[in-house]
Amino acid sequence: VPKQLGVSLEILMENAGRGIVDALWGQYDLFSLDNARSINSFVLFICGTGNNGADGLVAARHLMEQGVPVQIVLVGDTSKCSDLFALQLERCEAMGCIIDMYDEFNDWSNVAVAVEGIMGTGLTGKLRDLTVDVLHDIDTMRSQYNFDLWAIDVPAGLDATTGQIAEGTLAYDYTVTFGAIKQGLLLYPGKAVGGIAVVAPLGAPWQQVLGDRDITVTIDSDLAEKLINYRIPMAHKGVNGNALIIGGSNDMIGAPILAAEAAVHSGAGKVTLGVPEVIKQVVQGRIIPEVMVTYTEAHKAMLEGRQVVAMGPGLGRTSDIPDFVDSILDSYEGPLVLDADALYALGHVGSVDKDALRDGDIESIYAVKRDLPYCVMTPHLGEFSRLIDLPIKWIERHYITLAREFAKEHQVVLVLKGIPSVVALPDGTVYINTIGNAGMGTGGMGDVLTGVIAGFISQGYSLQDSAVLGVYVHSRSADILNDTKAWGYTPSDVSTSLGCVISELLGE
């Protein structure tokens, strides 16, 4: 804890314990536990011997003081406990709390709520055999007696940074976490096991408690409302921007159409779609009339007067595409959005040192092989794997770290499309999307996102704000559709619903 805060770790622990209590009261009438289960029902705290367990002891003490029946079971060797755990255990004993070692406890039938505080945020590898056995017992008893299970800060077995889980990790009903939601609770598989996350205040600015670190922010309606702007009454198509989408090939006509139409639906003043001349007539017959269609063979004229160029949807992977992409990058000096086949054409733009990544040596993880213009890049995991020459399984385990280092080293805005999608900025800030649904897992969704981001850039939003807004509006549109059908809605449906989300953000 930074000394300049003037707040001791003991005080923060006391605040954390009170936060657990408040979270429990927020979900239950703790004075009525006996009515729900039996006359002897209680809240069970399962505490390890470190500071995470000490947080649980503080909470148990406060609940007991309030007249709520509690019991405490201890996991581990108390002779090797942390100093603060020893202090909190002494206080609980002085108050007369019921405390047993875990292997001596057998009153599961009267447990109304169980709160697990075995280890907290410290895990980076496997769980100890003892912890696995305890968690297995908890899961068995929960199945038999149907009590809710809470985690303190993060579930035992969950890596608080990467979201990866160790073998034996349980699925929880709730996690009460302190100061700010832990990154691992937003990333799969951690998000799937953490249950409902409740953030409890620490009583000190959490940014200062955590120190000078790269920032991770959640993308939600509150953030999007701060970014969206009202239009001036005199707005016209020139004010609202001129966007160019480049893409399409003989085999992929739909992708650039989706992107261009999404740019229109997100509010761009003028949208032009550049496609190969051989498919121009077909595209004109299928696209909405608001989009003008030109051909890419005359690309110098095509680029003139654009506020943004988005390139890649359906572009193809023929041998001439890398040179074409390079020619656009050399010719156009304005804002760019690179997606799909434009990313493929770039090849390997960097490399990752697996040993440094495994060891957490952040400064040595990533090496740039190709300089990139300041742009928005929107790869999915497969495309990102090719860009950094690293297998997808490694990316999944180090999702945020790799996104952050890529954006910092290349000085680009990276929209890494996954579950969840993240936006990484050149300054090291990472935004994690908190909305969206499984119905978005269909071809063409990424093309719509590219068009949305380009549409916002054309209207004068910065690249980073356009990326964050684009991710939110795209996902929120899908969530609105999800209210009426869980899946089966199309990327075109998402595109046409974008205006509803923008109206929602503007309070109209």
Show where each model-derived region lies.
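Glycine-rich phosphate-binding loop signature in dinucleotide/nucleotide-binding domains
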Residues: 27, 31, 107-112, 143-145, ...
